[in-house]
Structure formats: C-alpha cells, structure tokens
Amino acid sequence: MNTLIPSEKRWIITGVLLAGLVGGALLFTSFIRAADETLFLCSTASAKSRAVAAAADYEATPIQLQAIVHYATSNVVPQQNLAEISISFNILKKLAPANFLVFGLGRDSLMWASLNPRGKTLFLEEDLEWFQKVTKDSPFLRAHHVRYRTQLQQADSLLRSYKTEPKCFPAKSYLRGNEKCKLALTGLPDEFYDTEWDLLMVDAPKGYFAEAPGRMAAIFSAAVMARNRKKPGVTHVFLHDVNRRVEKTFAEEFLCRKYRVNAAGRLWHFAIPPAAANATIDSGDYRFC
C-alpha cells in the first residue's frame, strides 16, 4: 500500500537526506584516509607526529559543516534529484580534492562545494542580481559573475556556422581570446582558463526563453577544455536538462554519445579523453564526435 507524504513534510525529508549525503561524504573521506594512515603508522617510526597531523586533516571543513546545518534546517533544496546528484557525487568521492567547475549558482551550490573538500570549486553565474544574492548569503563560495555572447534563439545558426569557422574546429579549438568562434567562451576570469578542470557541471546559464544565453557555448567550451586536457585521465562533464532540445542536440554534437557513461533523470554524464589520446586528428574536420 502506498503512503502519501504530506507536502509540508517533504522538504524536511529532502533536507535531512541532503544533510546525510554531505555528512556521509565527510565520513567516507575520513574513513578512507584513516585506513590509509593506519597502514602507514604500522610501518613508520614517526607514528605519533604523523597521527597528529593526520587528525587535523580529518576535520570537517567549515563549508561542510555549514552545508549540513543549511540543508537540515531549510525548505530550499537543490534543483537536481537524488539520483542525478548521486552520479556526480560518486565521481567526486573518487577524485576529491579536485578542480570542479560549475556553470550556475543555485540552491545546490553549497552542496557541490562541500562535496569537494579541500578542492577548488568555482561557480560561474550570468544573472547579476542572483549572483549578488547568493554570494551575500554564502560569501565563502568561490564565484564569478560572467557574461555570455550568445542567445538561445541563435542556437540553430550557431550549430551551422561553427562548421565553416576553422577556429572552432577540434584540432585548432581554444577559448581565451577566440573571438572568431562564437561558441568559445571569451572574456572570462583568468582562473577559468588557467585551471585544468577535472569535473564540469553544466546546469546554467538560463536556456528557457529566446533572449537567454542558452548553454550552447558552455557545452562547446566544456568539450574544448576536456579535449585539451594535459593531465592523465578523462574529464567528467555533467549536463543537466537534457530533456530540452538545445541541450540534447549540442551534447550529441560536441560531448559525443560514445563518451556518455551514465545518465539519470535529466542528467547525462560524459567521460571525455584528451584529444591527444586519439590516433588521428584531421585539422580540416569540424566534427568533434
């Protein structure tokens, strides 16, 4: 027999689940580190001093504690559901501390930052009023207000025109200062370009009305950064709202179905290898996939 949960109690349950998720992440990280340290202590003469140093490393970061309190006491919950969040969370558990780039500030920002303890989590937000509100309430978040060159109503023309602009081609693609490629994100803070990102979450900018920036440039630029990766391993790209035509079309054009490794609800997860891992790259080919 199904039991309906009263609507006024749903936010309490969701908040507790999220607080548990953050707390679980903290416990998981501490357990793994403690296990590693125990093995090490058994084989070293300086066990005591290293144990003291390790204990400090196990302590929860302020942002983790803030997240637990926030989601346990608030009726404001993230945009993504638990199944969608869990996909990114499972990768963060493996890679943290990592370099994590998130397009958009929102009700989930505190959660994402807390799930990447001692890593770099950077948020990019195009709505100035919303940026000011979120950063005022959570001044410890690392965030930049940014501007985009595109509009959602240009999506189809951008998808056609990039195929005739060599600066957009995968063999020659770059972002900083690439004014000729309209899909390249330019004019952003140096931190965006200078950091090699391990994970990218594309859940912004707005893409539900004609004059909105749309996510075309964010998706294209995520693909470029992943292909230009210098460090070992793949770049994980998470794209939300794939139920919408533009998100789905641009994902299949630039992130590639062959690199999609997981999905839940409205979220797709791609694991994209560096372009150097490909045997041959045709400098005159516009295709990413």
From Swiss-Prot:
UniProt keywords, alphabetically: Golgi apparatus, Membrane, Methyltransferase, Transferase, Transmembrane, Transmembrane helix
Could you provide one GO biological process annotation from this protein's UniProt record? protein methylation
Observed phenotype of the null mutant: Strong reduction of methylation of glucuronic acid in several oligosaccharide chains of plant cell wall components. The double mutant agm1 and agm2 results in the absence of methylation on arabinogalactan glucoronic acid side chains.
Cleavable signal peptide = none
Main localization is Golgi
Q: Where are the transmembrane segments?
A: 12-32
Q: How does it assemble?
A: Binds to the translation initiation factors TIF3E1.
Q: Which family does it belong to?
A: Belongs to the methyltransferase superfamily.
* Protein's name in the database: Arabinogalactan O-methyltransferase 1
Q: What is the lineage of its organism?
A: Eukaryota, Viridiplantae, Streptophyta, Embryophyta, Tracheophyta
